[in-house]
Amino acid sequence: MFPNKKTPLLDKIKTPAELRQLDRNSLRQLADELRKETISAVGVTGGHLGSGLGVIELTVALHYVFNTPKDALVWDVGHQTYPHKILTGRRDRIRTLRQRDGLSGFTQRAESEYDAFGAAHSSTSISAALGFAMASKLSDSDDKAVAIIGDGSMTAGMAYEAMNNAKAAGKRLIVILNDNEMSISPPVGALSSYLSRLISSRPFMNLRDIMRGVVNRMPKGLATAARKADEYARGMATGGTFFEELGFYYVGPVDGHNLDQLIPVLENVRDAKDGPILVHVVTRKGQGYAPAEAAKDKYHAVQRLDVVSGKQAKAPPGPPSYTSVFSEQLIKEAKQDDKIVTITAAMPTGTGLDRFQQYFPERMFDVGIAEQHAVTFAAGLAAAGYKPFCCLYSTFLQRGYDQLVHDVAIQNLPVRFAVDRAGLVGADGATHAGSFDLAFMVNLPNMVVMAPSDERELANMVHSMAHYDQGPISVRYPRGNGVGVSLEGEKEILPIGKGRLIRRGKKVAILSLGTRLEESLKAADRLDAQGLSTSVADMRFAKPLDEALTRQLLKSHQVIITIEEGALGGFATQVLTMASDEGLMDDGLKIRTLRLPDRFQPQDKQERQYAEAGLDADGIVAAVTAALQRNSKPVEVVELTTKVTEDMTL
C-alpha cells in the first residue's frame, strides 16, 4: 500500500496497537520516518506543519505508552495532529488533508475513534479531558485521559478554570504541557532529566504521600513550615510550584525530542497512584526540518511546498486581501489620530496588526488567547477616551460575547470591532467559519453592523469607524482577496444606516449585504435577459437597516431576495421584521432569504462552499424562479426615488 522505501518501519504500522508491539529501540527510527511522511504530506496539501513536526516524538511516545483509544488523547487546537492521524489508520488519506471530502486539519470525532474529542479552537483540552477522567472514575475504570496543550493555549483563562477543578479526577487525568516556545523554563541538561525521572517514579511519589501524612499530623505551625519547605525545594528543582498550587503533581521539564527521557516519564505517570499530574515537555516547532527551523514562524501554516528546498507555492498575483486593506487603511487613520489603538488575541499576523505594530508598537496590544479580556480591555480604553479597534476572527469573537453585551453594548462604549474571516473560510472548515457574528451582533442595542461589498467599501468603513464615537461599531469582512476595485483617492465617511442602489429595475429586487454583491449583479444580468427587470442594492449596514431604501424596494417589486454571508438571524431577519411590522407582505409580496444553511458546512474551496449554500448567481436565479412559480397577487408599482450610485465600479 505504501511503496515509499524510505519508511519501511512506518509502512508496517496501521494502528497504535501495532506500534506498541515494536521494540523500544526501534522508536527513534519510527519517529524519523513519521517526520518524513508528515513533511511529504503537507508538501502536497499545505496546512499546519511546524507544530506537527514539534510533537513527532511526543506522539510516538504517547501511543506507545498509553492504551489508545481506550485511554483518551485530547489534543488542544488539533493542528499538530497530522502525525497522530498517520499513526491511527489514516495514512492512506493523509494527502487529502483540508480538501473536499478529505481528512480534517484538526481532530474530529466522526473521523476516527482515536480522535477522542474534536478541537480547533484553543484551550479546551483540559476541560474535555477532565470530563473523560471523571467519567472513568464514575465508571470505576482505570482508563486515563491525557490532555496535550501548548504553552500558547495556557494564556486562556479556560485552561486555568479546568485545572482549578481537576483535583477530583485524581490519577486518571494527565496534562502534557507542550512548551514549544521555552516561555516557561528550558530543560537544564542531565540534572533536569534525572530529576524528572526521579520525581515521576513510584517510590518517590509513594514517599511523598507518606511524608504528606506525617506533615498533616504535625502541629499547625510546623506543618505550614514543612509545606513551604517542600514547595521551595520543588520550585528550585523543577519550577513547578505554580501548577502544584492548582492541585497538580508537576513533572518536568522533559526534552520532548528525547524518547529515552519521554517514555520512562510517561510510564511513571501512567502508573501513578495519585494525581492529577502535569508533565512539562519542552519541544521545538519545526524540529528536524531545516527550512522550518530557520523560518521566523517555524512554518506554522504553509502553502504547498517543495520539500527539499522548503519553498512554498506562491499565490497568483491579484487584488489585495481584505485583511491587508483593513490594516493599511487603519495605519493611515492612526497617523492622523493618536487616540487610535489596536487589540488582538494572539493573531497579529492573521488580522494584519503586525503591519500596524511596525508603525505604532506602543499602540498595538496582543493580549494572548484571551478574547473575553480583549473585549473588556477595549471597553476600558474606550471609556478612558481612546479609540480601540478590537481585531478578532469572527469565530473567536464568539468567545467574548458576554463582554460584548455587558461591557460594551449596555454601556454604549465606542469600541470598534474588526471582524475578520467573516463567512465561510474554505479549508479550515466549520470550526473556523464566521457564520454567526451577524446574528449575534444585530441583536445588540446600540451596535452598528457593517459589511463591505468590495475592498474600497472596506476602506471607507474603516475611515468611518475612526470618526464614529456615538457607540460600538463593527465591520465584518471575509477571508481572501478583494474584487480589484481602485483604492486611490480620499475615503468617505459613510452616513450611518444608509445603503446604495446600484441598479434599478421593476420586478425583482436583490438586497445584498457584503461581498455577495458581485454574484448579485451577475444574477441580475441573467434575470434581465429573461425579461425580469432587476434592482440591486448594496445595503452596507445590517444595523441600523436602511429603512427608507428597504421600504421603497419592498413596495415597488414583486420578488425580494436578501443575500448575506451569515447564518439565520442576521440581515434577513432585520428586513423581515421591518416588513412584518409595517405590513409590507400583507398583499402578497414574495420575500426569499438566502443565507448560510442551518448546518455546519465541511471544508472545501470557498466559492464551492458558497455555491453549495446557494449564495451565488445560480442560487439567486433559482430562488427568483421558484418564487415566481408560486401564485402571487398583483403588486402596486411605485416609482423609485432613490438614485442609482453613479460611481459604481463593479
From Swiss-Prot:
SMART domains: Transket_pyr. Pfam families: DXP_synthase_N (PF13292), Transket_pyr (PF02779), Transketolase_C (PF02780). It catalyses: D-glyceraldehyde 3-phosphate + pyruvate + H(+) = 1-deoxy-D-xylulose 5-phosphate + CO2. Keywords: Isoprene biosynthesis, Magnesium, Metal-binding, Thiamine biosynthesis, Thiamine pyrophosphate, Transferase. GO terms for biological process: 1-deoxy-D-xylulose 5-phosphate biosynthetic process; glyceraldehyde-3-phosphate metabolic process; terpenoid biosynthetic process; thiamine biosynthetic process. The keyword Magnesium applies. Thiamine diphosphate binds at H79, A120, H121, S122, G152, S153, N180, Y289, E371. One of its GO terms (molecular function) is thiamine pyrophosphate binding. Binds 1 Mg(2+) ion per subunit. Its cofactor is Mg(2+); thiamine diphosphate. Pathway: Metabolic intermediate biosynthesis; 1-deoxy-D-xylulose 5-phosphate biosynthesis; 1-deoxy-D-xylulose 5-phosphate from D-glyceraldehyde 3-phosphate and pyruvate: step 1/1. Its EC number is 2.2.1.7. Mg(2+) binds at D151, N180. Belongs to the transketolase family. DXPS subfamily. Homodimer. HAMAP family: DXP_synth. Catalyzes the acyloin condensation reaction between C atoms 2 and 3 of pyruvate and glyceraldehyde 3-phosphate to yield 1-deoxy-D-xylulose-5-phosphate (DXP). This is 1-deoxy-D-xylulose-5-phosphate synthase 2. It comes from Zymomonas mobilis subsp. mobilis (strain ATCC 31821 / ZM4 / CP4).
